[in-house]
Amino acid sequence: PVSKGPAVDAGQAVAAALAIQEQISTLNEALKKEGQPALRMRIGIHSGTVLTGSLGSSRRLEYAVIGDTVNCASRLEGLDKQRHQGMVRILISGDTQSLIETLPPHIAHESWGTVLIKGRLEPLEVIELRSTAP
């Protein structure tokens, strides 16, 4: 993947997460009709530099994305699972929020304050995004 710039990349990541959040109820209705359990998920988004590429030996190469940014996004996804309400929870970092010009009017955001993320010395500002659309 090639970056389109930090602001565009952050906006596209958040737009994708919001699209998932807004459409998962339709998917869950279809799953219910088939007798399948509903899906729930958590999404963490942090913006910054990552290292991408094929890693490993010539016998076994795997495409990977690594770095502090990836670690932070993963930690946001797994943060305080007891606070997960609804079908999809989206947590973004303050770094990501600062890159996004505007959110759609039907998107509420709630600050969780700053959180010390495992593996980092600096705490992250954490914001939850939630659709208020019916």
Cite the ranges covered by each PLM segment.
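Cytosolic regulatory/linker segments at or just downstream of nucleotide-handling modules
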Residues: 50, 81-134
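Catalytic/regulatory signature loops of cyclic-dinucleotide turnover enzymes
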Residues: 46-47, 55, 68-94
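Alpha-helical scaffold within the catalytic cores of cyclic-nucleotide enzymes
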Residues: 3-43, 68-81
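Active-site loop/short helix in cyclic nucleotide turnover domains
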Residues: 1-4, 49-57
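Sterically constrained small-residue positions within well-ordered secondary structures
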Residues: 34-36, 54, 117-120
